[in-house]
């Protein structure tokens, strides 16, 4: 069994863990509280898979049931019904995974970069989430790699065009052109996100990826990209 992890590390991002490129084990938005990341909850989502690098009966294999997972990450201030919507595991798939002797794992983390015009606070937030996920993978002995957005998007056949190039019309004022350009860029970004969601829905029809869950869609697609990358190296 090959376990792959896809991580979109932004605050509106997500994490997905997939078995053999087809079975979703974990599908979650990045745990946050307001402007803050929740590192303990983030780590708990990957903790069951740290045991891959231990002996089968090692003490580290603590979180091996759905109930244990829920207890590990539960926010005591979060209502039960809200919690169930935020954290999603496949209990049956996880149970089957824990019985496997022959397993391998690879995590793929999307590289982050600031955009033109973004301030220092935004750049710090980008780096913080990215660093937390890589630190969690390293601590849990889960091998990980970084991949740029355009690279995995091309490999997965996704739309990569989130920018546009417009020409200012004759007699068009700068302000009007700026508004038109801004609107066109926003539409291109929305179209790109929608295409990613559609592809994730096609690959995982049983996983409830909503129209605005582009972070979760990217995480699922990254996990599949990691699986295909691993397969290519083993051949």
Regions flagged by a language model, labelled:
Residues 1-235:
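Phosphate- and other anionic-substrate recognition elements at nucleic-acid/protein interfaces
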């Amino acid at each position: 069994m090959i376990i792959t992890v896809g991580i979109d590390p932004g605050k509106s991002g997500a994490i997905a863990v997939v078995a053999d490129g087809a079975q979703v084990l974990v599908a979650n938005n990045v745990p946050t509280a307001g402007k803050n990341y929740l590192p303990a909850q983030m780590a708990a989502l990957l903790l069951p898979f740290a045991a891959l690098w231990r002996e089968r009966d090692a003490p580290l294999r603590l979180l091996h049931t759905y109930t244990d997972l829920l207890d590990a990450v539960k926010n005591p201030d979060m209502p039960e019904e809200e919690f169930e919507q935020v954290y999603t595991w496949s209990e049956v798939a996880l149970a089957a995974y824990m019985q496997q002797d022959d397993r391998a794992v690879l995590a793929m983390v999307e590289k982050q970069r600031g955009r033109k015009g973004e301030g220092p606070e935004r750049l710090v937030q980008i780096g913080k989430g990215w660093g937390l996920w890589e630190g969690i993978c390293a601590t849990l002995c889960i091998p990980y790699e970084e991949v740029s957005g355009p690279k995995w998007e091309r490999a997965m056949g996704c739309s990569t065009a989130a920018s546009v190039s417009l020409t200012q019309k004759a007699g068009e004022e700068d302000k009007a052109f700026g508004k038109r350009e801004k609107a066109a860029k926003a539409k291109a970004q929305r179209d790109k996100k929608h295409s990613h969601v559609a592809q994730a829905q096609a690959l995982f029809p049983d996983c409830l990826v909503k129209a605005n869950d582009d972070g979760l869609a990217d995480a699922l697609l990254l996990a599949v990209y990691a699986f295909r990358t691993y397969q290519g190296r083993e051949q």
